[in-house]
Amino acid sequence: MSLADQVLAVNDDLPIRTDKPVHSGKVRSVYWLTEEDSARLIKEKGYNVAPDAPLAIMVISDRISAFDCIWHGEHGLNGVPGKGAALNAISNHWFGLFKENGLADSHILDIPHPFVWIVQKAKPVKIEAICRKYITGSMWRAYEKGEREFCGIQLPEGLEKDKALPDLLMTPSTKGILKGIPGVPEADDVNITRQNIADNFAAFNFSSADDIALYEKLLKDGFGVISEALANVGQIFVDTKFEFGYVTDAAGNEKLIYMDEVGTPDSSRIWDAQEYQAGKIVENSKEGFRQFLLNYFPDPDILLNKDRMPEREALARDNELPEEALMAVSRTYINIAEKITGSAIVLSDNPKQEIIDILGREYGLID
């Protein structure tokens, strides 16, 4: 069994019964179930959703995305062994902890397999909800060049790279290209202010202006829950991105929930606390892979400059990365997942066949 066989690189070709096109994202693919299958599963499994709620099967892959490109390695390694299972295990753990702490639900209704979530359709809030406790990365690069205002928040002079910020900062950006919002450029991933959101809450898909404060509370409280839990296993929660949406429960009540993934090495920076005390930054997140890419290629500007996307895409397409680089990511993700969850991440010999077998046998979704 080769390493390449243990990687689920293509996840949009499963024979799951659907009457809609499969949505294939950078890492996850979404299969919308038929009305009949959604209604049947809601009844059979007792999911706490409206009887006619649309359901989907969300399948994670082991692909690795960085700088908006998918990367691959030598020897046919088209992803990172264990990455998908590690990401899902971490998110599942945090979503459970959020519930225990009286925060909000997630869009996940069922977990048939380590790579698979059954989710209910949500109306997404069109904001990348970013929270930062330390100044690093793109924020530090901008600060070093003299910028002091971020998302309408004024930062003081004298901040130092990789040091804690005076307060937990919420620095939201747009999710997708939003058109016709005064003061908000029509481009993906543009920084926005709280005032932008308050003045145009409906355009960002908030149901009411009051929900802005609720999303901020869920963001701060969620950050706090994860930060405390990570501190208990010797890790620092540096910054992260959450996503939110609305769903309707079985009683017909609309509620704001967490969606996508939370507190993972893909969506967050996580540092080793002991190394940080000793003055070193050891990344237990995808940031380590980003740094590898910046050092590996002779012209890092290609990776940082949005005007050079065609060159960047060619770089990702035409270069096989060393196997060891992807295995280093594998070790990072599996180790941090096992620290967080307290359970072993078991690599599957044939994840695709396992998924097909379970969804056919226990859910009746394979034709």
Curated annotation (Swiss-Prot):
Keywords: ATP-binding, Ligase, Nucleotide-binding, Purine biosynthesis. It comes from the Bacteria. It holds the Pfam family SAICAR_synt. Coiled coil: none annotated. Pathway: Purine metabolism; IMP biosynthesis via de novo pathway; 5-amino-1-(5-phospho-D-ribosyl)imidazole-4-carboxamide from 5-amino-1-(5-phospho-D-ribosyl)imidazole-4-carboxylate: step 1/2. GO terms for biological process: 'de novo' IMP biosynthetic process. Its EC number is 6.3.2.6. It catalyses: 5-amino-1-(5-phospho-D-ribosyl)imidazole-4-carboxylate + L-aspartate + ATP = (2S)-2-[5-amino-1-(5-phospho-beta-D-ribosyl)imidazole-4-carboxamido]succinate + ADP + phosphate + 2 H(+). InterPro entries: SAICAR_synt/ADE2_N, SAICAR_synthase_Vibrio-typ, SAICAR_synthetase_CS. CDD domains: SAICAR_synt_Sc. Gene3D superfamilies: ATP-grasp fold, B domain (3.30.470.20), Phosphorylase Kinase, domain 1 (3.30.200.20). GO terms for cellular component: cytoplasm. One of its GO terms (molecular function) is ATP binding. PANTHER family: PHOSPHORIBOSYLAMINOIMIDAZOLE-SUCCINOCARBOXAMIDE SYNTHASE. Belongs to the SAICAR synthetase family. This is Phosphoribosylaminoimidazole-succinocarboxamide synthase.
